[in-house]
């Protein structure tokens, strides 16, 4: 299943991206943590490869690995993206 990036936040301290992903129909929304050397932007499309790897915008040489995923909640998004005090 392809995923559309709706929101993207890079967590420098953990060196990972936190993403809000939506399926093509817009009915399924997830929060995913991913490892990637490439910055992701809203509107990017993630296409599945294998072993939790995805290519970015159907470019097979631009990949990321999903390390954690969960159902979307506003509280969880705020927790993951807030600045440390």
From Swiss-Prot:
Pfam families in the record: PmrD
Keywords from the UniProt entry: Antibiotic resistance
Induction: By PhoP. Repressed by BasR.
Keyword match Transcription: no
Gene Ontology biological-process entries: response to antibiotic
NCBIfam families recorded: PRK15450.1 (NF011994)
Family, as annotated: Belongs to the PmrD family.
Chain's role: Interacts with phosphorylated BasR protein to mediate transcriptional induction of BasR-activated genes to induce polymyxin resistance.
Protein name in UniProt: Signal transduction protein PmrD
Organism placement in taxonomy: Bacteria, Pseudomonadati, Pseudomonadota, Gammaproteobacteria, Enterobacterales
Gene that produces this protein: pmrD
